[in-house]
Curated annotation (Swiss-Prot):
Residues 53-85 are annotated as: Disordered. The active site is at residues 211, 276, 305. It is a lipid-anchor. Belongs to the AB hydrolase superfamily. ABHD17 family. It holds the Pfam family Hydrolase_4. The lineage of its organism: Eukaryota, Metazoa, Chordata, Craniata, Vertebrata. This is Alpha/beta hydrolase domain-containing protein 17C. It is found in: Recycling endosome membrane; Cell projection, Dendritic spine; Postsynaptic density membrane.
Amino acid sequence: MPEPGPRMNGFSLGELCWLFCCPPCPSRIAAKLAFLPPEPTYTVLAPEQRGAGASAPAPAQATAAAAAAQPAPQQPEEGAGAGPGACSLHLSERADWQYSQRELDAVEVFFSRTARDNRLGCMFVRCAPSSRYTLLFSHGNAVDLGQMCSFYIGLGSRINCNIFSYDYSGYGVSSGKPSEKNLYADIDAAWQALRTRYGVSPENIILYGQSIGTVPTVDLASRYECAAVILHSPLMSGLRVAFPDTRKTYCFDAFPSIDKISKVTSPVLVIHGTEDEVIDFSHGLAMYERCPRAVEPLWVEGAGHNDIELYAQYLERLKQFISHELPNS
């Protein structure tokens, strides 16, 4: 039996040619490396779409294209809570909902529109009405808002923060296709929706990015000042994930967060597992070292890419950072 051909960081020569030569542009490389949108685990119904039988969960196989075809929902007044005139959230079994219908009814969902004309599914979880801070949470890969909803409720209630999140273009009920340019347009639309719809000012917004979500988070934070930034398992760039020995940013690289982090003027907390098997720990360390206003990082000994939240020091560090290191008056 012939020996397999040489591989570089898990990639064969043929895979490398497919990755970088078909064609060699950042958007195509980004799409091949990074985006794994799951089958949607939720649907959003506008008020006029809710009928007598609408209380039953919508089919899990609903697609982003179907959501995009829905008529645009009426926007409640800025800061208004869920009510008869609001959109409703319906979860499939795969969302693994862990709370009661009462908590689900309190989750606010609506659509926004990006500068690239994609329809963006947005979610506001009001966990701590009296809290000063709201997290603008950019989630990781291969999940959508339906799967993250339970986590948001648990996290927000424990760190005393409200949480605003959104699905990237091509994820969940958001229309379009996932791409690097769409990532940046998506978080811009989310930022504007949080500010205008809920009246949250930049000094009360904490940008939280996890894994691929650190890419739009760093981009936005490099352009706008906010209360703080939390980078959970960040990556330096797409090429550096595939090839750890890469020392500079090439023109065909994607997600060059390492070149943007020096422009972030807000306090930055970096969190990374020392045994991360997807984005090596060296990425978190390098991002931390480039931050002009980095605070004490959280290096979780023995943690991988998807289990940092299971370690006690995760919540402890977040509470310390938000409740004691940031202004709370």
